[in-house]
Amino acid sequence: MGARASVLTGGKLDRWEKIYLRPGGKKKYMMKHLVWASRELERFACNPSLMETTEGCKQLLQQLEPALKTGSEGLRSLFNTIVVLWCVHQGIPVKDTKEALDQLQEAQQKGKQEVAAATADGTSTVSRNFPIVANAQGQMVHQPISPRTLNAWVKVVEEKAFSPEVIPMFMALSEGATPQDLNTMLNTVGGHQAAMQMLKEVINEEAAEWDRLHPVHAGPVPPGQMREPRGSDIAGTTSTIQEQVGWMTSNPPIPVGDIYKRWIILGLNKIVKMYCPVSILDIKQGPKESFRDYVDRFYKTLRAEQATQEVKNWMTDTLLVQNANPDCKSILRALGPGATLEGDEPAFQGVGGPSHKARVLAEAMSQAQHSNDAKRQFKGPKRIVKCFNCGKEGHIARNCKAPRRKGCWKCGQEGHQMRNCTNERQANFFRETLAFQQGKAREFPSEETRTNSSTNRELRVQGGGTCPEGGSEERGDREQAVSSANFPQISLWQRPVVTVRIEGQLKEALLDTGADDTVLEEIELGGRWKPKMIGGIGGFIKVRQYDNVTIDICGKRAVGTVLVGPTPVNIIGRNILTQIGCTLNFPISPIETVPVSLKPGMDGPRVKQWPLTEEKIRALTEICTEMEKEGKISRVGPENPYNTPIFAIKKKDSTKWRKLVDFRELNKRTQDFWEVQLGIPHPAGLKQKKSVTVLDVGDAYFSCPLDENFRKYTAFTIPSVNNETPGIRYQYNVLPQGWKGSPAIFQSSMTKILEPFRKQNPEIIIYQYMDDLYVGSDLKIELHREKVEELRAHLLKWGFTTPDKKHQKEPPFLWMGYELHPDKWTVQPIQLPEKESWTVNDIQKLIGKLNWACQIYPGIRVKQLCKLIRGTKALTEVVTFTTEAELELAENREILKEPVHGAYYDPSKELIAEIQKQGQGQWTYQIFQEQYKNLKTGKYARMRSAHTNDVKQLTEVVQKVALESIVIWGKVPRFRLPIQKETWEAWWTDYWQATWIPEWEYVNTPPLVKLWYQLEQDPIPGAETFYVDGAANRETKLGKAGYVTDKGRQKIISLTETTNQKAELQAIQLALQDSEVEVNIVTDSQYALGIIQGQPDTSESEIVNQIIEELIKKEKVYLSWVPAHKGIGGNEQIDKLVSSGIRKVLFLDGIDKAQEEHEKYHNNWRAMASDFNLPPIVAKEIVANCDKCQLKGEAIHGQVDCSPGIWQLDCTHLEGKIILVAVHVASGYMEAEVIPAETGQETAYFILKLAGRWPVKVIHTDNGSNFTSSTVKAACWWAGIQQEFGIPYNPQSQGVVESMNKELKKIIGQIRDQAEHLKTAVQMAVFIHNFKRKGGIGGYSAGERIIDILATDIQTTKLQQQISNIQKFRVYYRDSRDPIWKGPAKLLWKGEGAVVLQDQEEIKVVPRRKAKIIRDYGKQMAGDDCVASRQDENQNME
């Protein structure tokens, strides 16, 4: 038996004996089970010695498992025993046999997956997510990306918002993807425009770098050989999926997918850095921050760092220790380099917490060593000292770390000290009467006498009952849900010390909600223990850890870990308190107020109260008196200078009055709020529930307190009739109706209040929008209503009432404008009014009702009704209905006659969306899960551009429906679209980057969407070629349009009231009209080309509609563009024909000079057009022919804060060197310099040089260490410069200088070969940017613009001073022949012969001789010797 029992030894045997035979059972595995198993194995002809190793157990399990299906219960027991034994050998922690079986099953599945993966790797080298597989003919073909993968990617981006986790998720989801797959993934998240723009820029830069490093080989590509991919091919914009597959599967392969993915990851890293701008160097542990929280922050930031894994490993090894607080740093160093965060985390327990200021481990160890040395050196008899305070040996009361006990240390009575004590009795400081006498909760003062202050805290143990001595059993769930008044309560005016029973032993212990663990002084507990060191009040102490110890506290039993050691006081920690439901309570817990402030630099409203009728004053006085009694408002005195006007209106269908406050002025001055809820919940998103209740919160806003510091700004006044008495002034104590902050603060407060109820009742669904609550569950109706009453009681505890009047218990439920039934929903009944005459206001209301109805009534249209009220019309203006609008309204009335209902959402079924074309640019859609049971319907009639087609509009409808579905149901439906695959593919080929739509299928629902015509990609051989052109004179509006053909035909027509763009289109229409069914057309108008290449089938332009009609008649049309004035035969000929008498003569002798200057400076087209008097098209063509200027398009210039004194500074890197760039925000003027190091000293020197050249008021920088240094701050202080720091990812923040960094690098790249050193190239690039590039505001160069801005600023300031001086004077004047002097009037301007003045609202010019100018002395009366006409008129007014 000894040999068989030796299967497990040491710690493994201890773990074996802790595992239960059954879940929830009492029996555990013992030694005898091992002996029995070995005998049974011999009976089954198996080797028992295999039980001694993990591998042996695995072999036994493989042998026994096939026989389980037909085996006996004994065989199953043997198998279970071997499974548990295998877990013990493996070191897998399990509590019982069932957990062991689960662990085995997991291990087996994992093994199968690894085998399958190894097999797949051995047979195929292509991706498993996006496989490129061989078809039946042996060709490699691509399987497209699945909607599930796309949905997962969209969900990641929406939930993680470009946090560091996005990058590994993208890498996983895009494993083996082609560039086309990657572009599809990017298009699905195209709504994040700013992030996608950054990504696009990185991809463009990488593509340009690829082209530079992989130049195209001269000559044609040999037959049978694939061309080499360019940067744009890798990005998927100029390559087909067949080419991408070919490159990826060629020999040797070119992994274009992996290359493109690497570029995207570079861009994602940049985006992540913007979203997570904190540097790893800034992550430092706070003095009171726990080590775990610090490590979490450290690794989260580390994931966002753009560095190699080696660098990140170095950061972990050095920075993690370096930036820890002193306590944790010393512990980390003491633990040594071999320590692991998981294994040594207990060493940091209590370190850095707010209630435990621990000493460092090294110090504790050294103290222990010193004490041992001292003991060895101690000689003579040992004197035992005993503490009077805690009664323990080893220290005296003066050095006692336990809290001081009240009263005499000898007898325990108060009123005297121990030295004056006459009693012989020893005090019992741990007597049971301290907190609970004979097991009962001590009595407390009544609610009336108890203070309402936040210091009146109580510990409450959930569940009634007596203390352990009473021996009461646990009660049922229903008995536990008693009112809080029956819970044992322990006041925190004194220390909460109670008697607890630990494994049958009584102990006094302190209930400590701030302690993690339960720590007791010396107590004998049976069983095994393990050593541990913890941080306590007096430093580190060594303790013994006992697991699964039973503790009884106040009739509640808990089983947990107990630490035993030399603690100054017994502590029951959170590991036990949470099990018994002990909570820290505040008897009266007011809703926490949200701090509110005014906008910076603004003061409260000071609007006078307007007069009110006696009836309204009486009503307001009555309302305010009642509100004052309820505490909603309180009176204020004259010290409050603010006021907001109030008035009263009668309620609908009632004689009662309603108080209204005009908070418009306060709303302008109050800070902005973020709406917590961005939309209203929709019934189509509700899951069908067996039991439903709808509640309404009464006086919602008046239940939430307003920030005390903000209340003074809500003051208002009730006046008295005829000013009989001073007005009564009040201010709000709660959220006022009509104030802009009330909705957001109420929603936030309501969410916090409902959160605990939601956690305690996960089976209850609560939809909350403002004061409307929808409560649904699958409980029986009686139990559901009990839960609703609990919710109402919970809300009432926080001061929110739910009136019975609006408590809906039976269907149909009226909620949010909808009508809810148990199995369906609809909108509340809609009645369309019948009117003889309709005003603009009536039609607006009518359209609103129809728009509301269209979410469930399919087919509703409002386009013709909307046309009736286009333009700026008065609300009361009568509108005449058109025939189309009358017909549309009649159709809508018919639709609304039959009631329509919507279904509820079933998560187990698929979402389907079907779209129909209604004609006239209107579309309808239905979203359903079962046919004819719509969840929701809707319409779409928006034209995003003047010229569009049905395919483009269809994609817009799909995107609207997809977005709506994600909002309501959290996923994208499968679409059924009225368009054939061939039609879609024909349009998608050219416009795949324009938009994204998910998986869809064709449904034959007339009218089908089709492309009415298609333009050819190459010239049509044999077809006549028309060179077309049009021209117009801007002044006379006269023009010509015409064509010439390659066969000698020509035609010119004259036009009136036209423009250049119209004339160009007219010429194309003329060519289409006079040509055969196949035609080639050549134009020099980019405008016309852009419209027609979009293949529109409808347009707001009459001429474009005519062109569309002509295009539909043609079989083949090829349309091409050539630049004007370039000597192209037919183009030049027609240009001369249409220009005669129309266009002004153009002198183009400056082209050569412009080309020469561009080769030197690479200036932009605007600068050349301005400097050399060239047409824009010619200047653009010069830029287009320059290979160095075709890397990227020009940046789109926006506008930020354009104050003249604001500069943005940033450091950028090029060729391994640092360039410090400063940009004048208003003008775009740039100063840049190569600096030797990115230090505060160099930055401060640069700022002082900049301030010496230009007036710098504000500099805006990022949070780099050089900009935040004290040297830079000192330089800014000396130069009087205000320094601001950027907000990450804010376009108003660092956008200008970031854009200029790219522009500077672009210019440097164009002229780099002209300079030997980078610092020279930088200064040359700055010169080119400032003086050789024109555009933007005013068409100036940046250098001209900054001078113009500064000069204008000086002139404006001077003019304001002059105006200010002039306004100090008043004018008396005589008008025509009237001898009476008039005045005083305001002086506006003083000239040599006349003055301009303003008398009341009239402005007059008066001759100088008829005017007398005097200084304005205010209301001071002039004396007898002060005559206005004697004032000196020649005072300096400049």
From Swiss-Prot:
Residues 440-450 have a biased composition (Basic and acidic residues). A motif (Tryptophan repeat motif) lies at residues 984-1000. It catalyses: Specific for a P1 residue that is hydrophobic, and P1' variable, but often Pro; Endohydrolysis of RNA in RNA/DNA hybrids. Three different cleavage modes: 1. sequence-specific internal cleavage of RNA. Human immunodeficiency virus type 1 and Moloney murine leukemia virus enzymes prefer to cleave the RNA strand one nucleotide away from the RNA-DNA junction. 2. RNA 5'-end directed cleavage 13-19 nucleotides from the RNA end. 3. DNA 3'-end directed cleavage 15-20 nucleotides away from the primer terminus; 3'-end directed exonucleolytic cleavage of viral RNA-DNA hybrid; DNA(n) + a 2'-deoxyribonucleoside 5'-triphosphate = DNA(n+1) + diphosphate. Residues 1369-1416 bind DNA. A motif (Nuclear localization signal) lies at residues 26-32. The record marks 987, 1000 as: Essential for RT p66/p51 heterodimerization. A zinc finger (Integrase-type) spans 1149-1190. Residues 630-820 form the Reverse transcriptase domain. The viral protease is inhibited by many synthetic protease inhibitors (PIs), such as amprenavir, atazanavir, indinavir, loprinavir, nelfinavir, ritonavir and saquinavir. RT can be inhibited either by nucleoside RT inhibitors (NRTIs) or by non nucleoside RT inhibitors (NNRTIs). NRTIs act as chain terminators, whereas NNRTIs inhibit DNA polymerization by binding a small hydrophobic pocket near the RT active site and inducing an allosteric change in this region. The keyword Phosphoprotein applies. Residues 813-821 are annotated as: RT 'primer grip'. Mg(2+) 1 binds at residues 696, 771-772. Its cofactor is Mg(2+). The active site is at residue 512. The reverse transcriptase is an error-prone enzyme that lacks a proof-reading function. High mutations rate is a direct consequence of this characteristic. RT also displays frequent template switching leading to high recombination rate. Recombination mostly occurs between homologous regions of the two copackaged RNA genomes. If these two RNA molecules derive from different viral strains, reverse transcription will give rise to highly recombinated proviral DNAs. Gag-Pol polyprotein and Gag polyprotein may regulate their own translation, by the binding genomic RNA in the 5'-UTR. At low concentration, Gag-Pol and Gag would promote translation, whereas at high concentration, the polyproteins encapsidate genomic RNA and then shut off translation. This is Gag-Pol polyprotein. It comes from Simian immunodeficiency virus (isolate MB66). The gene is gag-pol.
